[in-house]
Amino acid sequence: LEMGYQWRGLRHRGDFVYERLNLVTDMYEKTQNYNNQLDLQQQVNAAYAQLSGEKQGFSWNAGLRTEYTDRTLSHTLETSNYRYKQWHLFPTAQALWLFDKKQKLRAGFSRRIDRPTNRYLAPVRNHRHAEVEEIGNPELLPEIGNLAEVAYDKNWSRFSLNVTGYFNYVQNKIFKINRPYSRTTLIRSFANAGRTTSTGIDLSAEWGIAKWWRFFLAGNVYDFYISGDVDGLTVSRRSLNAALSANTTFTLARDLKLQWDASYVSRTITSQGEDTDLFLSGIALRYTFWEDRLTVGAQMQNIFNTNIQTLTIEGPGAYSSTEYTKYDRALLLSAGYRLNDKAKKGKAQKTEYGEKDF
């Protein structure tokens, strides 16, 4: 039996400043209602207990985690504070069957929380681009995800395979809400407007074709369903989605490797529209010197010039279709030298806010 307690706290303070150029005075002036000072404070107190066991190739664990969230957001455009206080329970259970050294079966259930970041909470109007203004919602609730999955792993001498079936149910799903603001501009906000489910199968395989050639392939196909109330309209939408990725590595010499990778994401629905498919591919060459201490590399991104995606939004009195295009291919050159083989790499502390905000 394992038990524990954890405390996490954060404070985000910042000034939102938006200025326009006055063509008469040739001076930048602050724009009313676009400037604000924000102070976000959040504390999470958590306690957990976990029980585990093992017998003759079978192992299991079950646990329960409880979290109490206390979040306060204040800003200068309003005198009142936004307060959110809530208890959450997170059960988890996992089981593992080892049939032999080369195959195993896993099954599990877990519940997770995804708290909204500053971008979604800040009640400050800002220009995302020329056609969209965005304002956060300080009353957003965290998303709660419930994941059940079963996975099978099998290894051969030069080939490995993983197949995973899963069902993911997300409560309090945060949707983007787009409304017409002017003839050419939408205003975007966020709301806990419904729920989503994803039911699918994930497959990955790695093949050592030869000593100098390895190939990896992964694919995910799932049924995606959205339901809820978006801006006063009942939404019930479904799409069959797919994602594919592949890479292959050629060892041209002992210290020289060539790698090609590709990824594809299919069309998918959103709460108010759809996103088209996207295909990306790149190639890289890597050479190491002096017992792998010095590394030089070259990487070409977007080699087929396919970095083009269209996002469509449709709602009451508004329609928007934006094509995001990056025509240029990018060549990246790199060089690195490792001074000490024995030096341990420091691990930066990861938080649920840091990676998303940056």
Spans of model-derived segments:
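Outer membrane beta-barrel strand-and-loop segments of large Gram-negative receptors
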Residues: 29-36, 137, 141, 156, ...
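Residues on the lipid-exposed face of transmembrane beta-strands in outer-membrane beta-barrel proteins
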Residues: 47-53, 93-97, 140, 150-154, ...
